[in-house]
Amino acid sequence: MPVVTDLNGILAPGMLVRHPEYPEWGLGQVQSNIGGMITVNFREEGKKVIDGARIALLPVFDP
């Protein structure tokens, strides 16, 4: 299992992210971040719930 930094802890609703393993999902907007489970609505894939302990989402500051 990859080592995940605590960067997911800063993700808040409205922030933009990308999934590091699925760039084809496109830009995603964080819907919620509760107990390390991050709900993201991806432009090309729809709504996904990401386990923040396993996947380090990539924040996007300048889309």
Segments the model singles out, each with a brief description of its role:
Residues 1-16, 24:
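Mixed-charge, Lys/Arg-rich low-complexity intrinsically disordered regions
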Residues 1-3, 47-63:
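Intrinsically disordered, low-complexity, charged/polar segments
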Residues 26-32:
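Short beta-strand-centered aromatic/proline hotspots
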Residues 33, 43:
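Short, loop-centered acidic/histidine patches that primarily coordinate divalent metals
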Residues 38-42:
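SH3/SH3-like beta-barrel fold
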